Structures are given as C-alpha cells and as structure tokens.
C-alpha cells in the first residue's frame, strides 16, 4: 500500500510540475508577444511620427544670401556666388572655401569633389574637399561642366559650328586633357551631360532637327579600354517622340534619362542597353533621384501634382498627391524634401508626410541637417 501511495504522490507531483512548466511557457510566450507588439507599435510610431512645429538650433548669417546658389554636397551643401564657393556642414558651419571672380558661376559636386565653371566664359575651379583648389581654362566658351569623385571634370564647350565634350584631370600637373569628343551640327546641340562618379563614362543628350522635326539623340561614351574607338562612343539611341532634357547617373553603371512625360533607365555603360521605362499621360513638372530611386511630380492641375517614386528596377514605392508649386525637390536619406519660396515639406518613402510648414522668411535652399528625428 505504501508503495502505491508513494507512486500516486509522485504522479501528482509530476503533474503539478508539468502544469507549472506549461504555465511558465505560456506566460513567457505571452510576455514575448506583448513585448514584440509594444516594439512594433513603438517602431511604427517612431518612423511615422509627424511634426507641426520646429525649433531653430543653428543660425548662420550669409552675406549677400539672396544672390547665392546652393547644391547638395557630401555631408552638407555647397554655397556659391560670383566671388567664391563655401562648403557648409549640416550645422551651418564653413568647412572650406575658395575665391574666384565669375560672371555666371555654375557648380557641380560628386562626393567631396566640386567644380565651379563660368558659363559662357572659359575658367573653371576644382576642389577636393579643401581650400587649395586648382584653376584651369579651356579654349572655348563653357556650356556645362560636371565632376567625378576623383576630381575628373567633363566640360561641354561651344565652338562656332560645333560643340566639344572634353575630359580633364585638373589635379594633374601635366596632360590635364584626358579625352576630347568633337560633335558637329548633324549630331545636334548638347542639352545635358553627366559624368559617372568614377569618371569612366559620359552620357550626353542632344537636340536634333530632322526633316523639320525636333528629336533627341542620347550618346554613351566610355573612356576605359572598351571605349578606345572613334570618339569613345559605345552606344547611342534616338528618341523620336520625346525630348530628353536631363540625364543623370545612378552609380557608375546605371543612367536615368528624363523626358517630357517619362523616364528611361539604361544600364551597363560598356555596352549600354535600356533596362526599363515609365511613361505618363501627364507632363513631368519635377524630377529627382538618388542611386536607388527615381521620382517625378506630374502636373495634375494648376494646384495639385502627383508624386511618384520608383526603385531602380522600375517598381513603384510611392504614389501621393502634393502641391504643384514646389520649386525644388530632392531625395536624401530615404526622405523626399520639397520647398517653394516660403513653404517646405518632408515625405517619407512610405507616403507619410513627416513635416509641412509655411515659414516667415524666404527659403533659398532646403537640405537635411543632423538627423535626430
């Protein structure tokens, strides 16, 4: 009998132990689930929170601020005018500066490299993240200039009956001219040119007139061993039904061509081929991109635009209505920044409007600062 009673107590104890273990497991699972839910809700709130006000953290006086121009640069901006250029960090502090005297300066930046060209003149200044920039001159009036991360500069020059695209390394003491691509009247007039970040490729959009009809021709040039043929030309394509007004590299091997009502994605700059396109019924009012996204604002009516953002392979990630009066749009750090004369807004790529505010003062440029929110 005692052995049976002892066994029954053992069974009861074992069952109690199983119940406690099961209860502990259930409580643990419940705690994990609750913590996961709290984390998800907190993270969702954090990435989708909206702001209706702002606080001034940094303020810097800019002499002749209304005459200054701005472009994105490295981890801040470039501020430039007729008598000089200044690199500014996200706190508004000057990082480096350079002086010159130009009638119509136009700047371009890639990484820490900057070029400022005197449009219509013959002088250029190039900088590599420091004050001691270098100056150089070309033989003909400058139409456009752009720079690579290494400091290689592509310059479009206008001659009497033709145009020339020349590649320079201004930081070399000898043989600064690396390559020269002459064009003639039959090739058309270069509307826009861009240089790859590594300086190995150039894409140029030309405006041509054939049988009285305007059309676009896009040419791809490569300066590696692959492009060592006549004029370094490795590919070209005619767009008969649309005018290409802007060309932009997305990294070293991908290019986006913007037309009146669509954009076209090209890849492989050694053997260029069109990888995708998006065409719209509405006219493109603004266009913007980074290495991973292409965005457009389409004109819906006089007051409203439609903002669409796509990945580099053409997948749509954003489709939302915005005001149509924005004069500057850019994408930075996974957010879209828009501004007009006195109004600015920030959208996340998931469509959430992070910030929307009308300011008391006139906006010259809108760019991301130190990201704490």
Question: Which sequence ranges carry the predicted segments?
Answer:
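Solenoidal tandem-repeat scaffolds enriched in leucines and small polar residues
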Residues: 163-258
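Repeated scaffold domains used in trafficking and secretory/extracellular systems
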Residues: 63-72, 101-112, 140-151, 185-194, ...
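Non-cytosolic head/periplasmic domains of membrane-anchored proteins
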Residues: 105-205
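Structural motif
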Residues: 44, 84-86, 122-126, 161-168, ...
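Aromatic (tryptophan-biased) beta-strands that constitute blades/sheets of beta-rich domains
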Residues: 47-66, 89, 93-102, 132-138, ...
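N-terminal Lys/Arg-rich, disordered targeting/topogenic segments
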Residues: 1-24
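Hydrophobic membrane-insertion alpha-helices, especially the h-region
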Residues: 25-43
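Extracytoplasmic/periplasmic/luminal assembly and interaction segments
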Residues: 70-120
């Amino acid at each position: 009998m005692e052995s049976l009673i002892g066994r029954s107590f053992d069974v009861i104890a074992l069952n109690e132990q199983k119940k406690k273990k099961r209860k502990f497991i259930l409580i643990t699972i419940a705690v994990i689930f609750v913590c996961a839910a709290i984390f998800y809700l907190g993270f969702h709130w954090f990435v989708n929170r909206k702001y209706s006000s702002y606080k001034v953290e940094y303020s810097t006086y800019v002499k002749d601020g209304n005459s200054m121009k701005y472009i994105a640069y490295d981890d801040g901006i470039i501020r430039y005018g007729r008598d000089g250029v200044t690199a500014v960090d996200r706190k508004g502090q000057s990082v480096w500066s350079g002086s010159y005297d130009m009638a119509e300066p136009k700047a371009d930046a890639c990484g820490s490299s900057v070029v400022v060209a005197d449009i219509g003149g013959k002088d250029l200044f190039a900088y590599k993240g420091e004050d001691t920039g270098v100056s150089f001159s070309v033989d003909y009036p400058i139409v456009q200039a752009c720079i690579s991360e290494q400091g290689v500069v592509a310059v479009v020059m206008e001659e009497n009956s033709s145009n020339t695209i020349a590649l320079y390394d201004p930081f070399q003491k000898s043989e600064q001219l690396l390559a020269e691509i002459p064009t003639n009247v039959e090739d058309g007039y270069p509307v826009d040119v861009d240089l790859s970040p590594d300086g190995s490729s150039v894409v140029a959009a030309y405006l041509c007139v054939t049988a009285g009809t305007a059309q676009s021709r896009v040419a791809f040039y490569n300066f590696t061993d692959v492009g060592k043929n006549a004029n370094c030309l490795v590919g070209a394509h005619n767009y008969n039904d649309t005018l290409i007004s802007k060309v932009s590299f997305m990294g070293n091997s991908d290019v986006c061509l913007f037309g009146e009502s669509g954009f076209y994605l090209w890849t492989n700059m050694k053997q260029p081929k069109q990888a995708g396109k998006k065409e719209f019924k509405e006219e493109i009012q603004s266009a913007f991109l980074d290495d991973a996204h292409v965005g457009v604002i389409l004109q819906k009516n006089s007051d409203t635009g439609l903002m669409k953002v796509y990945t580099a392979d053409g997948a749509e990630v954003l489709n939302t209505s915005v005001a149509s009066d924005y004069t500057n749009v850019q994408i930075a750090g996974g957010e879209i920044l828009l501004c007009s004369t006195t109004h600015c807004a920030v959208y996340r790529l998931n469509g959430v409007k992070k910030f929307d505010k009308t300011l008391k003062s006139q906006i010259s440029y809108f760019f991301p600062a130190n990201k704490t929110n």
